[in-house]
Amino acid sequence: MPDKLKYIFLLLICALGQSAFAQAPTNPNYPGNNPGQQQRRLNLNDTATTKLQSTDQQLDSLRKRMDKKRDTVVFSSKFIRVTNERLLRDSTQLFPLDTGIFNFENYSPLLQPRDPKISLGNTGRDERSLLYDPSRTIGFDAGLHTLDAYLLNPQDINYYRARVPYTQLYYISGGLKEQIFKVLHTQNVNPRLNVGFNLNFAGSQGFYSSNQVLEQNVSNVNAAAFTWYESKSKRYNLLGNLIYNNLKTPETGSILKDSIFKTGSIDKTTEQVRLPATYENWAGSGLYLKQFYYIGRIDSLKKEGGKSLNILPTQRVAYTLSYNTRKYNFIQNDADAYRVFPDYYFSSNHSRDSLSVTHLQNDFSYSFYLRSKNVRFIKNEVKLDVGLTQDYYQYSQYISDTTLNQYGNKVVQPLKVQGASFQDITLKAKLSYRLSDRIGLDGDFQQIAQGRDAGDFLYDAKLKLGGGKKAGRIIFEGYSQSSTPPLAYTNWISNHFIFHDKFKSQKTNSVSFNYINDALKLDLKAEYFLISDYLYFAAQPGGIDAHPVQLGSDINLLKVSLGKSFAWRRWHFDDFLVYQKTDYQSTIRTPEFYNYCSLYYKMFLFNVLYSNLGINVRYNTEYAAPSYATGLGQFYNGPDIKFSSYPIATIFFKATLQHTNFFVMYDYANQGLFSPGFYTVNRYPQMDHLLKFGVSWSFYN
């Protein structure tokens, strides 16, 4: 009997143990059973029961938990596409956003490697091209262009297709010497409508006479609001922008100490200038609307990679409306104690000269495309564009003069000295033929048929020959141009300069050969110019009386440029050379040789920082430096002075990290090695060495 009780007792213990284990789930996801989870204390007093859920309820609960998790999609530049008006002229083309750091440190419009400029000292001051670079426009021209590099024009606006809002902040700092800040924002309101804005600020105290002199500060503001609408059928497009420009730059007449690099200076910011409170101001605004509609069959061509399409129309009609006003002001608040001006006609110690120009343009065009239905690549395509442009201009010029009011007191009032209104009618035609994707011929013809500038023309022809990626491509081009003399050369009235002249139209004929090989990273271009009735400003020997002059002889000019990039492992060397030769070197006043080279080492630091460390060097040979006419806004041929020329070196480090690009550079790092400073314009010393910092942030949200 005791043995039977022993077995019955053992069986009861086993049954109780089984019940205890049944209350502890063996699911590894249960708190405490998964060693990877944090232990959670159980409330033994909790008597609540868990309600059983159906399969649909369990899926809903899982969906809620997934929605609460953080979105794992990383927005980047892949969600942004960009284009501009030029790329939309023939078809709808979109390109990825450029987020690289190539040429990032060359932010200034004065120091672009392939378009160097001379200036009065620093960014924001009056400038012109160092190399010969003729204008290829016809029609009315006010003749004032020394601040063109800082203007924001309708053709400078980019248009976007943004799947997410895109914002870019851009900041450059060289201390009080130079600061630039830019903001760009764009987003799609819906898949077909994009809006955005640009806002640019530039300020500079410069390097000389900047000690607590507000009038000597550069202060530039550019603002634009833009939009791009594309219909659902992709037939209708609308480009629009509103632009505002306000540029202010000092007109110092140069510093008093002409030999500052020989005698030195204790503090350059306190060096006296001839006109400490005189400046010029350009202000203007404009509206630009361009509409085009595709008629008939629409083709599409896939880009490389097949991620996006080019929309190719067979017929297109376009209309452009442009309206802008611009006012050029010269404000003199100083007595001319150091004879900056050759003369005065209305007031000896102050000037309020201004020129106001209003421009209204209506442009109509029709395009016809003839191509085969197979558009894997363009073959045997003929394109014809015809158009008509109406330009209406109204200008007025004012000075300030002292008059007697009704009470017999002397007062200074603005006085209108001239004004006119007129229109030009321009006929346009463009013919293009593409035998294949490697052979193409383009002809572009513009002729002003009626109006003030009737007779102006620009005829241009190009032949493009492609030989594949390894062989490269060749472009032959020739153009002929005749343009009416600008207003500043023929009919100008201001306090210090008055011109009433008649000149012939300036004519330019040019032919060029351009060989481009992307595989070899080679770009060779040879250009020949024949210039007749060349217009420029000059002064009497030893004088400062700048006035317009027309050369009676033809000018021959040869310009050869070569660009080449080399790479060896992580070392890279980019070089650009220009050789210019003319039979009127003292008239054109440009250097015979120019070179820009960049040597840098590519690195990938800490496995996250793509960076370049290198040096840029600019050099040009000696040339007769032009002078600058304060109050006229023109560079002119003054004393035949040549300044010694030495290389100018800049050391830089630039990098990119996720959505941020930045650089640190030491500009003019070799100052004092060859010379204590340099000139590009007579009597206007250029920048000193300066540590600069720049950063660009991109946001995609």
Question: Where do the model's predicted regions map?
Answer:
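Membrane-proximal, glycine/serine-rich, low-complexity loop/turn segments characteristic
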Residues: 23-284, 295-311, 464-471, 684-686, ...
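Bacterial N-terminal signal peptides
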Residues: 9-17
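Bacterial N-terminal signal peptides that target proteins for export
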Residues: 1-9
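Sec/Tat signal peptide C-region and signal peptidase I cleavage site
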Residues: 18-22
